[in-house]
UniProtKB/Swiss-Prot annotation:
Disulfide feature: none
Record-level GO cellular component terms: mitochondrial membrane; proton-transporting ATP synthase complex
Keyword Mitochondrion: yes
InterPro entries (alphabetical): ATP8_metazoa, ATPase_protein_8
Pfam families, A to Z: ATP-synt_8
Function field: Subunit 8, of the mitochondrial membrane ATP synthase complex (F(1)F(0) ATP synthase or Complex V) that produces ATP from ADP in the presence of a proton gradient across the membrane which is generated by electron transport complexes of the respiratory chain. ATP synthase complex consist of a soluble F(1) head domain - the catalytic core - and a membrane F(1) domain - the membrane proton channel. These two domains are linked by a central stalk rotating inside the F(1) region and a stationary peripheral stalk.
Name under which the protein is recorded: ATP synthase F(0) complex subunit 8
Entry keywords, A to Z: ATP synthesis, CF(0), Hydrogen ion transport, Ion transport, Membrane, Mitochondrion, Transmembrane, Transmembrane helix, Transport
Similarity annotation: Belongs to the ATPase protein 8 family.
Subunit structure: Component of the ATP synthase complex composed at least of ATP5F1A/subunit alpha, ATP5F1B/subunit beta, ATP5MC1/subunit c (homooctomer), MT-ATP6/subunit a, MT-ATP8/subunit 8, ATP5ME/subunit e, ATP5MF/subunit f, ATP5MG/subunit g, ATP5MK/subunit k, ATP5MJ/subunit j, ATP5F1C/subunit gamma, ATP5F1D/subunit delta, ATP5F1E/subunit epsilon, ATP5PF/subunit F6, ATP5PB/subunit b, ATP5PD/subunit d, ATP5PO/subunit OSCP.
Chief subcellular location: mitochondrion
Membrane topology note: Single-pass membrane protein
GO molecular-function term, one example from the UniProt record: proton transmembrane transporter activity
Length: 55
C-alpha cells in the first residue's frame, strides 16, 4: 500500500508549509484598510438619567 509510505508525502507537506509561511505573511501584513480608525476623544458623553414612568 504505497499511500502508507510517508517518505514522499511528508516532504511535500513540509515544503508546502514552508512556502505558505514565507510567501503569505508578507502579503497579508501588507494589506491596508481603506478606512483607518480615527482616535476618539477622552471625554465621556453626558448622559441624563432616564426615569421610566411606571403606571
Amino acid at each position: 500500500m504505497p499511500q502508507l509510505n510517508p517518505a514522499p508525502w511528508f516532504m511535500i507537506f513540509m515544503f508546502t508549509w514552508a512556502i505558505f509561511l514565507t510567501i503569505l505573511p508578507p502579503k497579508v501584513m501588507a494589506h491596508t484598510f481603506p478606512n483607518e480608525p480615527s482616535p476618539q476623544g477622552m471625554t465621556t458623553p453626558k448622559t441624563a438619567p432616564w426615569n421610566w414612568p411606571w403606571h
